[in-house]
Amino acid sequence: MNYRTILLLVGWVITLTACHSSPSSVLKKAMQMENVSVDSIFFYLQQIDKPENLSSKEQGDYYFLSYKATLWKTGKPVESLLQTAIHRYMQNGQLSQCLQARIAQSASYLYSNQPDSTLLISDNLLRQQLLNDTLRTQLYGLKRVVYSRNQNYGQALNMADSSRWLTRKNKDTLAYFSASRLYLNLLKKVQKIQVKSTC
């Protein structure tokens, strides 16, 4: 081979590799689309042919993002994606991500009409020391929904009050307004029930 052929071959290889993004960079782009567009998330995730080529830490993010995008698109949780994400997060000591995935798992049991499982996981997670107030508020919200569905409005009211207190503590005005509205609606229900029971 002559010098010119070698240069042409090297240029061709560089062009091919430059056009193909690494799985890690594609995953980052997909994660940036999380609050933008579900279709965009799928567009990027489908470009990752083999998730096993991602680092073990990135695999957790890949499966968790796949789970969320599928849930948002279809309205149905795919438990296997979530289990894989939780496993990867635990394997790599990614405790914060693991907590978020476990909260999603608790919510998925609610979608699957398994309220006792939602309560069990939520109670277990509420004992975690690494839990921040935002995640704690999400868990109180899940428990509130379960108690409301079971018509245990007193407990639902307690959960709504806990959420309201945390959002006020964090000075999150919008979240506080939302939590207060839920609290007041539940309070009205409890008061109606009390009036009916005294009549």
Please tell me what each predicted stretch does:
Residues 2-5, 11, 16-199:
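A "functional boundary" signal
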